[in-house]
Amino acid sequence: MKRLSCLLLGILLVFSLCACQQAAPSSGEAPDQQAITEEATEYFNQMMDGDFETFFNALPQGVQDNISAETIQETWEEEVDKLGGLPENTSPDVSCYVPEHSDQIRVEFVIPCEKGDFKVFINYSPDGSLYN
């Protein structure tokens, strides 16, 4: 009985140590949100000019496997049409933040249109790499 108790306590101790272990430290400093915003703005402006390939080619392979540059462009154009078109000579409101319950970094572009706001989100991983 004593050996069984020691065995159970030993197993409990191992599980406790594993559960209380600190997370592995991040592999570097937090990414520069200004640099991320600038990169995302460049992608956004390219898409505004009709170049969806550059953004698509920068996406992770797993995302590229499930979507195409044409699909991104079609979705963009459908949304613009639904909102009554984009106003001429306008610049988006741009914000960069970490959404609640997420560790991603989001750059949000908003252009007020006739029938609502045209919104584009470009997400980055915590290490600063393009996510989607």
Q: What are the roles of these predicted feature ranges?
A:
Residues 1-6:
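Positively charged n-region of N-terminal signal peptides that target proteins for export
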Residues 38, 53-104, 113:
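Short solvent-exposed beta->alpha transition segments
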Residues 15-19:
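C-terminal motif of bacterial Sec signal peptides marking the signal peptidase cleavage site
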Residues 117-132:
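Short beta-strand edge/turn micro-motifs at domain boundaries
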Residues 52-53, 129:
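Primarily extracytoplasmic ectodomains and periplasmic/lumenal surface modules that are beta-strand-rich
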Residues 20-49:
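Short, low-complexity N-terminal intrinsically disordered segments enriched in polar/charged residues
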Residues 107-109, 120:
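Hydrophobic residues positioned within well-ordered beta-strands of beta-sheet architectures
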Residues 11-12:
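Repetitive helical segments and hydrophobic/amphipathic motifs
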